[in-house]
Curated annotation (Swiss-Prot):
Mn(2+) 1 binds at D352, D424. Its cofactor is Mn(2+); Mg(2+). Interacts with the terminase small subunit; the active complex is probably heterooligomeric. Belongs to the skunavirus terminase large subunit family. This is Terminase large subunit. It comes from Lactococcus phage p2. Mn(2+) 2 binds at D352, D523. Its EC number is 3.1.-.-, 3.6.4.-. Binds 2 divalent metal cations per subunit.
Length: 540
């Protein structure tokens, strides 16, 4: 346990806090250490070889120096042997789960593991795989390995002499016929393999569990095999990531001598408020990633629930939902203004039409002296209002009494019933209707209204606005303008809709509107966002 003790000394000197999950792993190692063959020699050989031959391939080109924590990880991966049922001495540890905050060099570390296995693993004709959600992610780790063949003096000589070479299938170390290949997360393709080292990258992106398909082939055909699951945590629930977290936290897994879990994460959400606790999720912070970068992300997330979710998931290792309420009470506050701001002013319209079930909203915005003003006509049918529960009906009644929600005495929303109200707003304010944005799925229903107010032969005054993640830029712009008090509204129904509005966070960090509860109506928010997009488009 030489490297465990060195890591503990390092943590004490640098104020790094160990969470309860890592403490459990340490207890497990102590138990295992007393039962099995300790391979200090193999671990030290791997560490020295890596530090002698490997380079950082981004930023300054310099040799890698593994931190005490990373050396300990190598001790867990390579430090113990057992005697199997055939009487053969084999590597004890088959599975490692590394849950580690974003920017901590997971892919670079895995590149060293792959090359150490290919060249020093002593296995003739073996195969190593990097498995990822898609080909782009798989290439990330694959390219880290390939870059070392150009950066490292030793590997470059191997490369130049065709000892280490690229093939159509991947990379090959010809002396031992060991290969390294990339593969996407496809259960059918994984059947029947016989790989010895498997790197499952960013497992929080996986829906179905491919691990058993890969591990089955390794387990049946290889004496020495190892699968390493790496992730920065994520927002996809009920997939492989959640299964792994649950498994590696369990008592059953604690007594499985052939695996180690490295769950670097906060123990609860409240701990994020004290920066000292961040070392629970980012044990290498200060080296990778930089303190300043993580602090900047934390500060940027203040006042933005969606960014806070992402920070807790990707930086602090906590399983978070991919949906979060988006606007804060400060964002949605009412500011009184007079509708005269629309008088003779270019006015942009967004319309979100729902025939029945949700609300229909027609939002008007105009610009004046650096601020955007909005007013929204919101509609429903009386039969829907009458079916509400008491609490919701009282809320809607307030909107009706304020003149902000218009109830129509029809079975469903008829576009022709909206026209008198639009006419009334135009007459009352003297606004100049300029452009309209609408959901293309509703065009045939809205066509008459659009042509009535926004006809032009080139169609420049009309825009079909794709819904979903395509609205990302304008969703974020609306948030920004509300937070800076540069978008002004004075309607309770709009405040309610904004407070109802959640965003779903995509894999690339894009947002799309959604709602958490059926009773949460967000149609005025959607209409306002489309109107804002039209206003911005007229400035470009």
């Amino acid at each position: 346990m030489y490297y465990l003790n060195k890591m503990l000394e390092y943590n004490k000197e640098n104020g790094i806090i160990i969470n309860k999950y890592i403490r459990k792993t340490i207890q497990k190692q102590i138990r295992i250490h007393n039962k099995y063959i300790y391979r200090y020699d193999r671990v030290t050989q791997a560490i020295e070889w890596i530090e002698d031959n490997f380079y950082l391939t981004t930023g300054n080109l310099m040799k890698i120096e593994l931190l005490p924590t990373q050396r300990w990880w190598y001790e867990l991966m390579l430090g113990y042997d057992m005697i199997d049922e055939k009487g053969v001495q084999v590597n004890l540890i088959n599975e490692i789960f590394l849950n580690l905050g974003r920017g901590s060099g997971k892919s670079s570390l895995m590149a060293t593991r792959v090359l150490n296995w290919m060249i020093l693993g002593g296995q003739y004709g073996g195969e190593s795989l990097v498995i990822a959600y898609d080909n782009t992610q798989a290439r990330h780790v694959f390219d880290q390995v390939r870059n070392q063949t150009e950066a490292s003096d030793t590997l470059r000589v191997y490369n130049e002499n065709k000892i280490f070479k690229s093939t159509k299938q991947g990379l090959e170390f010809t002396s031992f016929k060991t290969t390294f290949k990339k593969q996407t997360n496809d259960t059918l393709r994984a059947q029947g393999g016989n790989s010895s080292l498997n790197i499952f990258d960013e497992v929080h992106t996986y829906g179905e569990d491919i691990t058993e398909s890969v591990n089955k082939g390794s387990r049946q055909k290889q004496d020495n095999w190892q699968s390493i699951y790496i992730t920065s945590g994520g927002l996809k629930r009920d997939g492989l990531y959640d299964k792994l977290v649950e498994r590696f936290k369990s008592e059953e897994e604690f007594y499985n001598d052939r695996s180690f879990g490295l769950l670097y994460m906060l123990e609860n959400h409240e701990q994020v408020k004290d920066k000292k606790n961040w070392t629970m999720a980012l044990p290498l912070i200060g080296s990778v990633p930089k303190w300043s970068g993580v602090i900047e992300e934390y500060e940027l997330a203040q006042g933005d629930p969606a960014l806070q979710n992402k920070f807790l998931a990707f930086n602090m290792g906590l399983p978070m939902q991919d949906t979060a309420y988006y606007f804060t009470p400060q964002d949605t506050k009412l500011t009184d203004f007079n509708l005269s701001v629309f008088n003779k002013n270019r006015t942009y319209v967004g319309i979100d039409l729902s025939l029945i079930g949700d609300l229909t909203a027609v939002s008007f915005v105009c610009e004046l002296e650096g601020k955007t003003y909005s007013h929204t006509l919101t509609f429903s049918v009386r039969s829907q209002y009458e079916q509400l529960d008491t609490e919701q009906q009282e809320l809607w009644t307030e909107f009706v009494d304020r003149g902000e929600l218009i109830l129509l005495d029809t079975e469903y929303i008829n576009v022709n019933d909206l026209i008198p109200h639009i006419n009334d707003f135009r007459t009352k304010t003297g606004c100049r209707l300029r452009k309209i944005g609408y959901d293309p799925a509703r065009y045939e229903i809205l066509k008459g209204l659009i042509e009535r107010y926004f006809f032009d032969k080139d169609g420049d005054n009309q825009r079909a606005i794709r819904q979903g993640f395509s609205m990302n830029d304008y969703i974020k712009l609306l948030k920004s303008k509300l937070a800076e008090n540069k978008l002004i509204h004075n309607q309770k129904v709009m405040q309610w809709a904004l407070n109802n509005t959640a965003v779903k966070i995509g894999q690339s960090g894009d947002y799309m509107y959604t709602k958490k509860l059926e009773k949460d109506k967000i149609d005025p928010t959607v209409a306002l966002t489309m109107a804002l997009e039209m206003a911005v488009s007229d400035e470009v």
